[in-house]
UniProtKB/Swiss-Prot annotation:
Placement of Sequence repeats on the sequence: 2-3, 4-5, 6-7, 8-9, 10-11, 12-13, 14-15, 16-17, 18-19
Region Disordered: start-end pairs: 1-22
Keywords per UniProt: Repeat
Coiled-coil features, chain-numbered ranges: none
Gene: OPG197
Induction of its expression: Expressed in the early phase of the viral replicative cycle.
Keyword Nucleus among record annotations: no
Domain of life: Viruses
Family of this protein: Belongs to the orthopoxvirus OPG197 family.
Compositionally biased intervals (Acidic residues): 1-19
Region (9 X 2 AA tandem repeats of D-T): 2-19
UniProt-recorded name of the protein: Protein OPG197
Length: 88
């Protein structure tokens, strides 16, 4: 009669938890990097839009000169409306 005894001992070290934690940290770091990149791109686009939508120094100077005159012309009223709309 052959009796087979199991001499194997299962030494299951739990490395899955360490791997999972590392993966979660990697994912969080990647999300943070992507978030920073997105915020930087949004800031760049906002600056482009501010520069594009804001009147140049020449227009601003002309508005100041024309609105500071004493005449009550229609041009002055139009210029005042424009300057108010663009936030000067």
């Amino acid at each position: 009669m052959d009796t087979d005894t199991d001499t194997d001992t299962d030494t299951d070290t739990d490395t899955d938890t360490d791997t999972d934690v590392t993966n979660v940290e990697d994912i969080i770091n990647e999300i943070d990097r992507e978030k920073e990149e997105i915020l930087k791109n949004v800031e760049i686009e906002n600056n482009k839009n501010i520069n594009k939508n804001h009147p140049s120094g020449y227009i601003r100077e002309a508005l100041v000169i024309n609105t500071s005159s004493n005449s009550d012309s229609i041009d002055k009223e139009v210029i005042e409306c424009i300057s108010h709309d663009v936030g000067i």
